[in-house]
Structure formats: C-alpha cells, structure tokens
C-alpha cells in the first residue's frame, strides 16, 4: 500500500525547519512531507537521515580541514578536524562545529584522546556530515591538564574568519619549581604563548639537548672521520663540535633562535633565562608540547 505524500507545506514552516536544523531547503521540505507536516517528527527525520548519510560517507578521504587550539588555563587542547574539501573547511558551520568541539573538550577538564570522544560530540559530528554532505573526522586530538606548577600557551596560525580555527596550531607547557602566584602565572602565560608561536614556526625534533640520541653523535663523528681522515684528531674533534652545534640549532628547541625579537637575537634557552627565570626568580622548564598542521 502506497503512503500518501503530504504536500500542503507552507514556505514559512520549511524556513523554520531550515533555521532549526541547518539542513538544506529541499531536505527540510522532504522531511515535512514525509511526516505530514509534523515539525518535531521532521526534526527527528532529518537527524536520522543525517546519521545514515554519515555512515555512508565514513570511507571518504578527508585531506582538508582545520587545526583548533584552545585553553581555559586549566586544560589545553589541540585538535585536527578533517573534511573532504577546502570549501567545506571554510564554511561557518564547519568552523562553528570545530570551535565548539575543542571548547567542549577543554571544559570537561580531563586528559583526552581521539579514542574516547563521547557520544554527544560524535552525534553532532554525524549530524554535520548530513548537513554538509561530506565526511568529517577528528583526525588528531590531545588535551592536557595543568598541574599546580604549570601554565599553558596556545597559538593558532592563519586563523579563518576570526575564529580559533586555523591551518596550524601549537600548545606549550611551562613548569616552575615552586608554586605559582598570580604574578608568576601572568608572566609565564605570556611566555608560554610566545614559545607556542616559535614552537610551531621552528618545528623542533627535540626540546632539550640531552634528548638527542648518542647514535646521532656517533654518526656525525663517523662522517667527519670519513671526510676529514687526513686531519689530526684535534682538528676532527673541532669539526665534530661545529657540526653538532649546527645539528642542535636545527633540531633542538632550547638551542633554536627565539625569532620574535629580531633586535636582540637569542636562543630559546636564553629567552627563558632572561625573560622568565630572572623576572619571576624561579627555575622554568618546558613540559608537554605539541604542534599540528594541515
């Protein structure tokens, strides 16, 4: 038996459903026709349709998207949210979802990973898939909870439409030896934000020199012995030292250039010593760090 299609749907009702659901006009019209003009049932119809479409698009490649970074000073989070096309990545709906997503994660105030996104967030993602007609994936998600002695800095690069969504982002944690005061916190937070900028710009492989494997030193020494075998051991050691300094400058954050102050060149280590440790009269070290780019 064929079901009679309800066609007496007002334009006003269709527009109201469009505003409430964010779904395309044609989908709203079809939803109202399929539910005999019942607004609440039409909302549910669109929700179920969106979930079904999300399942169909799960296998689609997602090579575009945004990076979002955010902190409420207790938790810092950095996420990569992917979609299929650059066009969708710049829509207000996608940027709003990405912004609300990262803020929800941060305000839950717990360590998080992509594997334990709660069902509410996942349902919202699926609904957006139905609206935008593209697969949307949380590609990378990390959240960190501050300790009583640490502060976070965050940075977003190339922000889109005045949001916290961009093409790159970073999080840097600074840790003190003694407990924080309000004054210390304010100074360190500014420093952490500055370091987040440089961390994304420099993209170091290591934070500190001691993290570099002895294998790297051995490899450089072997290369020098092979290339400069005719030179004395003292000369070779001098060359090794120079090559290691270059390696550290290229790969180790503490030895890289703090490029935000071109008038007074200094390394990250020197910046932390002069601008942070001397000012707050306390030892400061870099803790958890992460950067992501599209």
Swiss-Prot record:
Report which superkingdom the organism of origin falls in.
Eukaryota
**SUPFAM superfamilies xrefs:** Elongation factor Ts (EF-Ts), dimerisation domain, UBA-like
Q: Which GO terms describe its cellular component?
A: mitochondrion
Which of UniProt's keywords are assigned here?
Elongation factor, Mitochondrion, Protein biosynthesis
Which cellular compartments is it found in?
Mitochondrion
| Molecular function as annotated in GO | translation elongation factor activity
Q: Tell me the Gene Ontology biological-process terms attached to this UniProt entry.
A: mitochondrial translational elongation
Job of this protein: Associates with the EF-Tu.GDP complex and induces the exchange of GDP to GTP. It remains bound to the aminoacyl-tRNA.EF-Tu.GTP complex up to the GTP hydrolysis stage on the ribosome.
Extra facts: This protein may be expected to contain an N-terminal transit peptide but none has been predicted.
Q: Which family does it belong to?
A: Belongs to the EF-Ts family.
Q: What's the name of the protein?
A: Elongation factor Ts, mitochondrial 2
Organism phylogeny:
Eukaryota, Sar, Alveolata, Ciliophora, Intramacronucleata
């Amino acid at each position: 038996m064929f079901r009679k299609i309800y066609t007496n749907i007002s334009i006003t009702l269709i527009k109201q459903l469009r505003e409430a659901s964010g779904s395309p006009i044609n989908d709203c019209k079809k939803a109202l026709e399929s539910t005999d003009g019942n607004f609440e049932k039409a909302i549910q119809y669109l929700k179920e349709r969106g979930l079904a479409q999300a399942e169909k698009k799960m296998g689609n490649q997602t090579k575009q998207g945004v990076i979002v970074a955010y902190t409420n000073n207790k938790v810092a989070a950095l996420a990569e949210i992917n979609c299929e096309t650059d066009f969708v990545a710049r829509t207000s709906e996608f940027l709003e979802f990405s912004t609300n997503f990262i803020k929800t994660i941060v305000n839950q105030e717990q360590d998080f990973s992509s594997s334990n996104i709660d069902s509410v967030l996942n349902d919202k993602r699926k609904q957006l898939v139905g609206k935008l007609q593209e697969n949307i994936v949380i590609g990378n998600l990390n959240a960190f909870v501050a300790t009583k002695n640490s502060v976070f800095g965050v940075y977003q690069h190339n922000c889109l439409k005045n949001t916290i969504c961009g093409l790159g982002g970073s999080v840097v944690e600074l840790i003190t030896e003694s407990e924080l005061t309000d004054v210390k916190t304010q100074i360190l937070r500014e420093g952490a934000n500055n370091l987040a900028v440089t961390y994304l710009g420099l993209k170091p492989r290591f934070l500190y020199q001691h993290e570099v494997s002895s294998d790297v030193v051995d490899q450089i020494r072997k290369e020098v012995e092979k290339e400069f075998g005719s030179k004395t051991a003292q000369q070779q050691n001098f060359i090794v030292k120079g090559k290691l300094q270059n390696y550290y400058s290229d790969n180790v954050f503490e030895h890289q250039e703090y490029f935000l102050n071109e008038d007074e060149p200094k390394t990250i280590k020197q910046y932390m010593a002069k601008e942070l440790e001397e000012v707050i009269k306390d030892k400061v070290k870099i803790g958890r760090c992460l950067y992501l780019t599209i």
